[in-house]
């Protein structure tokens, strides 16, 4: 179990950087564009697995996002029933849109979403990121009308490895996206969890003690994240 947890964390980290190693040992996939990402097996394999999830309507507390979500061991950190993790390493806003039907099928009680850092990494235009995120929120409200929706801000980073983007450039884009999300959540009457400043140290860096590599969270980061949202899961 411990080995599986470590292996899964390593896979999530590599996936978030645009590197997928099947079984973490053999087949290596690298992508630098959105189109390339959807050609590697990782996304379809996860969706196939998610299709098998079954639950009574209005019982599941669902987390959906990219590698930061996928690496979140919900049962270990939150220690409660009916938790579902639909994180996929490397995923982007368009990927979330493609698989919202899986969320609709489950009709969760609560939905926690965090997505966007990979869109920024792949240099997808901000206008498109915002448009697709707005579609995600609107679609969730229509397809899961009884669910409580929590849009979590994109977290700070310490630059993004494998790109030419400085931390200043990344931080500017993340702040712009978070500002849009905050306004969008007010307009659409859904919850916005502004986690960014809680994870931030001076100059928009992700706090060193919360990360392995400057973008993905370590156990301490997940423990801290859990503390911020636990009260929202227990009511």
Regions found by a protein language model. Give the residues of each.
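N-terminal secretory targeting modules
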Residues: 1-62, 74, 234
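A short helix->loop->beta-strand "cap" motif at the edges of active sites that frequently abuts
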Residues: 144-148
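Catalytic His-Asp segment of secreted/periplasmic serine-dependent ester chemistry enzymes
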Residues: 156-235
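Oxyanion-hole/transition-state-stabilizing segment in secreted/luminal serine hydrolases
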Residues: 64, 70-82, 94-131, 150, ...
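N-terminal post-signal-peptidase region of extra-cytosolic proteins
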Residues: 46-49, 92-98
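Generic structural signal for well-ordered alpha-helices
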Residues: 100, 133-137, 178
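Acidic/histidine-rich helix-loop elements
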Residues: 34-37, 80-93, 121, 214
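Conserved beta-strand scaffold positions in the cores of enzyme catalytic domains, especially
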Residues: 63, 83-85, 192
């Amino acid at each position: 179990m411990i080995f599986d947890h470590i292996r899964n964390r390593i896979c999530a980290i590599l996936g978030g950087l645009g590197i997928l190693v099947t079984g973490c040992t053999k087949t290596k996939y690298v992508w630098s564009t959105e189109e390339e990402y959807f050609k590697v097996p990782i996304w379809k394999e996860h969706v196939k697995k998610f299709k098998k999830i079954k639950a009574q309507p209005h019982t599941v507390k669902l987390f959906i996002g990219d590698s930061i979500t996928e690496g979140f061991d919900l049962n270990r950190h939150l220690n409660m029933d009916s938790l579902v993790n639909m994180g996929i390493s490397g995923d982007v806003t368009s990927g979330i849109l493609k698989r919202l039907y899986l969320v609709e099928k489950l009709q969760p009680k609560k939905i926690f979403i965090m997505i966007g850092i990979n869109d920024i990494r792949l240099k997808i235009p901000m206008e498109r990121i915002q448009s697709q995120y707005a579609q995600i929120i609107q679609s969730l409200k229509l397809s899961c009308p009884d669910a409580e929706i929590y849009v979590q801000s994109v977290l700070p980073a310490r630059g993004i490895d494998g790109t030419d983007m400085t931390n200043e450039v990344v931080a500017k884009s993340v702040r712009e996206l978070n500002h849009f999300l905050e306004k969008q959540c007010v307009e659409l009457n859904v919850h916005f969890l502004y986690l960014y400043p809680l994870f931030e140290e001076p100059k928009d860096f992700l706090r060193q003690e919360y990360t392995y590599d400057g973008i993905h969270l370590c156990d301490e980061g997940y423990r801290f994240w859990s503390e911020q949202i636990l009260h929202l899961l227990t009511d």
